[in-house]
């Protein structure tokens, strides 16, 4: 088979297994497939895997650090690893294109390499983590949905974020409340900065705005 797919909502909902081995022909882990599998500690990600669905591993105690996602994987769904409280390190493949809303929020991830080729980062994708530094690749100019990019990585630890050239807008609430943020570049291509994009960044002492910037939001 190719899919570990949901069945009436959740395939392995609250499953009581510690380790799972997926066969090499699995291409998709479906929505809520391992939702709150509260005893799950370890599983393999086959090289055939192309997508991880929404809420696939929501609130599971995965203890694979680093969590190595395979080359060939292109999409991580919304809330896929949200509330995985034991997760402290993730290695993304060079093939990843999309990271969904809150995909890694409320984890203990302290570092992540976002590869060139990544095209989209969802709303609160790294909210409430332990990230200290983030570099957004030049290929990634699309942030979030609805409240675009709000609280992209709101946490107590983020100190530095590097934004890509070609970015035209810093969205609403982008790094709002990142109280330890000391350094952020604003690319010369930025035209608009949204409301509360940098609100409550109390450790940020210096900013350079591009000459061509057209609007600066409130807060």
Residue ranges and their predicted role:
Residues 1-2, 13-28, 38-51, 62-75, ...:
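Structural signature of tandem-repeat unit edges
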Residues 144-146:
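Short, charged, surface-exposed secondary-structure boundary motifs
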Residues 10, 30-33, 53-56, 77-80, ...:
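Consensus positions within tandem repeat domains that build extended binding/scaffold surfaces
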């Amino acid at each position: 088979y190719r899919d570990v797919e949901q069945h009436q909502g959740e395939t392995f909902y609250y499953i009581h297994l510690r380790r799972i081995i997926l066969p090499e022909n699995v291409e998709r882990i479906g929505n809520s497939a391992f939702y709150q599998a509260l005893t799950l500690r370890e599983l393999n990600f086959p090289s055939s895997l192309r997508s991880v669905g929404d809420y696939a591993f929501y609130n599971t105690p995965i203890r694979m650090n680093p969590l190595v996602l395979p080359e060939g994987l292109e999409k991580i769904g919304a809330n896929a690893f949200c509330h995985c409280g034991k997760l402290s390190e993730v290695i993304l493949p060079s093939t990843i294109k999309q990271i969904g809303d809150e995909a890694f929020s409320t984890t203990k991830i302290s570092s992540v390499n976002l590869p060139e080729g990544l095209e989209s980062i969802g709303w609160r994708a790294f909210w409430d983590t332990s990230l200290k530094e983030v570099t957004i690749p030049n290929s990634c100019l699309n942030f979030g949905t609805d409240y675009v990019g709000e609280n992209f990585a709101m946490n107590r630890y983020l100190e530095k974020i590097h934004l890509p050239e070609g970015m035209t807008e810093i969205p609403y609430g982008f790094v709002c409340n990142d109280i330890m943020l000391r350094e952020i570049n604003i690319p010369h291509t930025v035209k608009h900065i949204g409301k509360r994009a940098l609100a409550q960044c109390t450790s940020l002492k210096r900013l350079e705005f591009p000459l061509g910037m057209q609007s600066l939001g409130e807060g």
